[in-house]
């Protein structure tokens, strides 16, 4: 849809350039052909309209793939208001195409922190007043937190929140433990078809792409340090190994550390004997002095701290593929070192003091996306086929919670339902099956005898709840 086709008088949006809508529409049509699970759900539930009456507040990266998600939610009966969960991740043509379709959206690439907060507010507010929303779709937890702290009255009507990412799930679990969470949540992140596809295979595809776009560096033969070896770390390490890099991994979890060793990566620590006492003396300067690229993948804070940044090799590339920019101590860099913008989302950080700098100075770091998500700041993120699984899970999770009607329950029933849980395995398998069909694959069916032998039904689910894929 081009801007010319926008509903007359529609002004409930703010994007960078509405004239980009036709470009966004062309890309969205291509993305639809690469998202068989999501489009399969759209066709399957179109007549049933399971989200009719749903009013969804959405805050997730405003990309072309998200445009397909939004239009699927709308096709299944929902109304939505949308913003991006990251100041650099919006694809402006995608936001324009959604606005041109008459859907409220507030997102553009390169927002300031203040503009980001404003966009979150506009997601919640319609004509200056809180919209009568009844569902939340979040990525990272900023929207959920804002609703709890500033607009708690909105939550009285909300049936639940579906959370996309590790960081947001951690925040939800923390709120639940403290008795602060007011609505139930579905942990979309830990669905197998999200965590293994998006977190692992998506990062395998998009990390090296973003680094190369941002730096134009050849990566082969250089040394990389991947901080963290969860699903995101696993995909990131593979991504850099594919480029011919010499990849080292650092971990705090013995199980993930063992997996890194088994996968053939050298397990190291940036700290002498693995102990960070907060001083420069605890840093393994011999190790960090050889590192050409460091990437954080953890969702934790200051995993690349000031002392590590001081010890890194001259001209090393520093980036993050976790959710927030606090994995890298960018606050220290802003306070103590001079920043020189090379191009959007690429900075030389001169380690020669704050203020002025010599352009010929060679003691600098190259920081990508200001320490925020590198794959969406310096590139276009995961491909459509990867996001297909994640967003199909989001649709099923929205349907699941909307049908539960939490807001209409008695206080006693609400107390029982106030949880943070993953989708039922059967729905995870439904997404996986649609993805397999999209690849042209054929899944073998169990015979009744075989199903009985392993104690499952022919239709599934096929694995016990505790099974680790």
Swiss-Prot record:
Reactions catalysed according to its record: S-adenosyl-L-homocysteine + H2O = L-homocysteine + adenosine
Annotated residues for binding of NAD(+): 165-167, 199, 228-233, 251, 300, 321-323, 375
GO cellular component, one term: cytosol
BP terms from Gene Ontology: L-homocysteine biosynthetic process; one-carbon metabolic process; S-adenosylmethionine cycle
Cysteine disulfide partners in this protein: none
Sequence positions that bind substrate: 63, 139, 164, 194, 198
Broad EC category: hydrolase
Pfam families with a match to the protein in the record: AdoHcyase, AdoHcyase_NAD
Entries under Gene3D superfamilies matching the protein: Adenosylhomocysteinase-like (3.40.50.1480), NAD(P)-binding Rossmann-like Domain (3.40.50.720)
Subcellular localization: Cytoplasm
Pathway membership, UniProt: Amino-acid biosynthesis; L-homocysteine biosynthesis; L-homocysteine from S-adenosyl-L-homocysteine: step 1/1
Presence of keyword NAD: yes
Cofactors named for this entry: NAD(+)
PROSITE patterns: ADOHCYASE_1, ADOHCYASE_2
Molecular function terms from GO: adenosylhomocysteinase activity
UniProt remark on cofactor binding: Binds 1 NAD(+) per subunit.
Entry keyword set: Cytoplasm, Hydrolase, NAD, One-carbon metabolism
Recorded family membership: Belongs to the adenosylhomocysteinase family.
Task performed by this protein: May play a key role in the regulation of the intracellular concentration of adenosylhomocysteine.
Protein name: Adenosylhomocysteinase
Lineage: Bacteria, Pseudomonadati, Pseudomonadota, Gammaproteobacteria, Pseudomonadales
């Amino acid at each position: 849809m081009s801007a010319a086709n926008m509903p007359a008088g529609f002004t409930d949006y703010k994007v960078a350039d509405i004239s980009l809508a036709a470009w966004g529409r062309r890309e969205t049509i291509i993305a639809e052909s690469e998202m068989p699970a999501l489009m399969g759900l759209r066709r399957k539930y179109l007549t049933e309209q399971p989200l009719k009456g749903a009013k969804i507040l959405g805050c997730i990266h405003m990309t072309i793939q998200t445009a397909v998600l939004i239009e699927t939610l709308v096709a299944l009966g929902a109304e939505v208001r949308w913003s991006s969960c990251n100041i650099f991740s919006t694809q402006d043509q995608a936001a324009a195409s959604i606005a041109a379709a008459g859907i409220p959206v507030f997102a553009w690439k390169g927002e300031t922190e203040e503009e980001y907060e404003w966009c979150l507010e506009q997601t919640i507010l319609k004509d200056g007043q809180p919209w009568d929303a009844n569902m939340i779709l979040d990525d990272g937890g900023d929207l959920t937190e804002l609703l709890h702290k500033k607009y708690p009255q909105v939550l009285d009507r909300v049936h639940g929140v579906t959370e996309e990412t590790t960081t947001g799930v951690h925040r939800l679990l923390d709120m639940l433990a403290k008795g602060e969470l007011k609505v139930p949540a579905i942990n979309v992140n830990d669905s197998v078809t999200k965590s293994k596809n998006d977190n692992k295979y998506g990062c395998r595809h998009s990390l090296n792409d973003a680094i190369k776009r941002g730096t134009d560096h050849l990566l082969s033969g250089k040394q990389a340090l991947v901080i963290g070896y969860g699903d995101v770390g696993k995909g990131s390490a593979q991504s850099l190994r594919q480029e011919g890099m010499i990849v080292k991994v650092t971990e705090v979890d013995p199980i993930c550390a063992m997996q890194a060793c088994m996968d053939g990566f050298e397990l190291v620590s940036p700290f002498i004997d693995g102990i960070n006492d907060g001083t420069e003396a605890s840093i393994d300067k011999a190790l960090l002095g050889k590192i050409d690229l460091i990437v954080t993948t953890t969702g934790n804070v200051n995993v690349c701290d000031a002392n590590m940044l001081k010890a890194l090799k001259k001209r090393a590339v520093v980036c993050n593929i976790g959710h927030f920019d606090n994995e890298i101590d960018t606050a220290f860099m802003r306070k103590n070192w001079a920043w020189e913008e090379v191009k959007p989302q690429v900075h030389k950080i001169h380690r020669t003091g704050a203020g002025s700098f010599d352009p010929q100075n060679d003691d600098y770091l190259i920081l990508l996306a200001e320490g925020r998500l590198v794959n969406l700041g310096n590139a276009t993120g995961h491909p459509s086929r990867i996001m297909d699984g994640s967003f199909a899970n989001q649709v099923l999770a929205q349907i699941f919670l909307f049908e539960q009607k939490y807001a209409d329950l008695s206080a006693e029933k609400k107390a029982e339902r106030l949880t943070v849980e993953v989708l039922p395995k059967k729905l995870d398998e439904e997404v996986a099956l649609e993805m397999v069909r999209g690849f042209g694959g054929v899944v073998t069916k169990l015979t009744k005898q075989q199903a009985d032998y392993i104690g499952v039904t022919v239709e599934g689910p096929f694995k016990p709840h505790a099974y680790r894929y």
